[in-house]
Design a protein with these regions (language model features):
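ABC nucleotide-binding domain "signature motif"
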Residues: 61-72
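The feature captures the beta-strand-to-loop junction immediately N-terminal to the Walker
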Residues: 41-43
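A short, flexible loop at the N-terminus of ABC-type nucleotide-binding domains that lies
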Residues: 1-36
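A short, proline-enriched helix->beta-strand linker immediately N-terminal to the Walker B motif
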Residues: 147-152
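Helix-to-loop junction immediately C-terminal to a conserved catalytic motif
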Residues: 56
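ABC-family P-loop ATPase nucleotide-binding domains
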Residues: 71-141, 145
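Conserved small/polar residues in nucleotide/adenosyl-binding loops
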Residues: 156-158
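Conserved Walker
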Residues: 46-50
């Protein structure tokens, strides 16, 4: 990855769902430099979720979407994570397992210092049982899980 390439580059992006005649995104331009933080704010239906899924390569389109100079659909770069809302409904994360065991099962032991900092910051208790916590607590566990590894690009939609 060249340090001079933007982290994200999208020009004149148009997207519409097959089931709709209206555009979800129309003429969208976005350039994010490495290390930048961007918060997408908009009304329901404005295209925030669609844009994040496109950037993550989770939804296909014919646009030229570059992440670290690579096309997300044809040669997706490594080092990208997408934390989406679907995760909270997954039966695996609603099982009878402690947060400690769950985080270890996804590699938390490899990043223990970073994991512990996130647990403290997000006020997550390792003894919580995943099937007994609220949706808000489950999303905090998801953030901890998703941010434990040092990703090059984190796309967070929760």
């Amino acid at each position: 990855m060249s340090a001079s390439l933007p982290a994200v580059e999208v020009h004149n992006l148009h997207y519409h769902f097959a089931s709709s005649t209206s555009s979800a995104l129309e003429g969208c331009d976005l350039v994010l430099e490495r290390g930048a933080r961007c918060l997408l704010i908009g009304a329901n239906g404005a295209g925030k979720s669609t844009l994040l899924r496109l950037l993550a390569g989770k939804r296909l389109c014919e646009a030229n979407i570059l992440v670290f100079g690579q096309d997300v659909f044809h040669s997706p770069p490594c080092g990208i994570t997408f934390l989406g809302t679907e995760w909270a409904m997954n039966p695996v994360v609603r099982g009878d397992i402690t947060v400690s065991d769950f985080l270890d099962s996804v590699g938390g032991f490899r990043f223990s210092e970073r994991r512990d900092m996130l647990l403290d910051l997000l006020d997550v208790d390792l003894s919580w049982k995943m099937h007994m916590i609220s949706d808000g607590e489950r999303r905090r566990v998801q953030l901890c899980m998703g941010l434990m590894a040092p990703w090059d690009l984190s796309l967070i939609h929760i």
